[in-house]
Design a protein with these regions (language model features):
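Short, hydrophobic/aromatic-rich segments at coil-to-beta transitions
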Residues: 76-81, 191, 200-202
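Conserved beta-strand hairpin/beta-sheet module of binuclear metal-dependent hydrolase folds
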Residues: 68-134, 216-229
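Metallo-beta-lactamase
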Residues: 104, 111-113, 200, 205-207, ...
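Hydrophobic/aromatic beta-strand patches that form the interior of the parallel beta-sheet core
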Residues: 80, 145-147, 171, 204, ...
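Accessory terminal helices/loops
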Residues: 34-59, 248, 252-337
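N-terminal export signals
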Residues: 5-30
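A general structural motif
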Residues: 102, 140-143, 167-168, 257-259, ...
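Active-site HxH/HxHxD metal-binding segment of metal-dependent hydrolases
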Residues: 112-196
Length: 337
């Protein structure tokens, strides 16, 4: 099956469905008699939701940690946000789970630095079962799309758990496979729209932290998910000009679309602006994962003033032009202004 059948259209072009939609429509019509009425994901926007006041954040002793391997928080009835336990991975990535009438999208699948005895697939299946019970659906009728924001192992290490799961498609581990999964032909500028079944996710490229990275905008909650390109932690800028270009694309998008929250994939900062050391497995006073468009703008403006290697706090994130193994300041296009 053409992977692009779950895309509605290229957002920069005329709204013409891609190949495979006709077959999908026939299948939907045949099963309409037994399916409940579709959920309306496009009225009364943005769909209201909330983040928890405190996420699971590790413990002084990982050996004595009693929290579940993954915390599941329902932002609203059709959106779950998962977070990996820091006792299993000090990266503790977040993983949005978006539900539509036909498909479910899982973004970022966690890491296995400290322990690998965690069943992400089982937890995702539990979430799908719960959503289907609430909405009168058959879990087998929903296709699961397993994707990630970028090519770092803390975002895809658990993808293999889904390899033999029925009715599932997952993103490959090369740049070409990532871009091809979304049917893109002009990365990173091109926007494509993923149709989950009445719920649209807008996707485009956001390189800079790494070459292969995407931004995801959920039209239902109006949350902009930025992965590691912009998050409450150490934003390692490996490629300065692509990063500035990506930040400009994010801001341009926010200028023309309503955005309730900007959300990254990690939290590595305390509420007081403390930079938690790399590899720490206990962060008792974490800052919230959600950010604002204004904080995105402030970080973009701040980055243009950086002229020396170091780590710079914008008030929201740490901009790192000297990573753990690579200094990249000489690539900052603003260095000699």
């Amino acid at each position: 099956m053409d992977r692009r059948t779950f895309l509605t259209y290229n957002a920069a072009a005329v709204a013409v469905p891609l190949s495979g939609m006709g077959l999908s429509a026939l299948t939907d019509a045949a099963s309409a008699a037994v399916r409940p009425a579709p959920i309306d994901f496009k009225s009364n926007l943005p769909a209201q939701g909330s983040f928890p006041k405190k996420w699971i954040c590790g413990s002084p002793s990982s050996m004595d940690n009693t929290d579940p391997p993954v915390q599941v928080h329902w932002y609203n009835p059709h959106t779950a946000i998962l977070r990996q336990n820091k006792a299993y991975s000090y990266e503790a990535p977040f993983a949005p789970l978006y539900f539509g009438n036909d498909r479910v999208l899982l973004l970022d699948e966690g890491f296995v630095q400290l322990r690998n005895d965690w069943d992400l697939r089982g937890i995702v299946d539990q979430c799908i079962d719960e959503w289907c019970r609430r909405n009168g659906r058959d879990p087998a009728s929903l296709e699961l799309l397993v994707a990630f924001s970028h090519l770092h192992a803390d975002h895809y290490a658990a993808v293999n758990q889904f390899a033999d799961r029925p009715n599932t498609r997952y993103m490959g581990l090369t740049h070409e496979e990532m871009v091809g999964f979304w049917g893109m032909t002009h990365f990173p500028e091109e926007r494509v729209t993923l149709d989950l079944g009445g719920r649209d996710i807008v996707i485009w490229g956001s390189p800079g932290h790494v070459v292969s990275e995407f931004a995801y905008y959920d039209s239902h909650t109006q949350i902009l998910y930025t992965g590691d390109m912009f998050y409450r932690g150490r934003c390692y800028i490996s490629f300065w000009q692509p990063w500035f270009d990506s930040m400009k694309r994010l801001i341009d998008f926010c200028d023309t679309h309503p955005v309730t929250h900007v959300m990254g994939c990690h939290v590595e900062i305390s509420v007081d602006g403390e930079d938690y050391p790399y590899g720490l497995t206990y962060q008792p006073d974490e800052a919230p994962v959600e950010m604002t468009v204004q904080q995105l703008r402030e970080a973009f403006a701040y980055a243009q003033k950086i002229t020396e290697p170091g780590i710079y706090f914008t008030g929201t994130v740490f901009l790192c032009n000297q990573t753990r193994s690579l200094t990249t300041i000489d690539k900052n296009p603003y260095r000699y202004d």
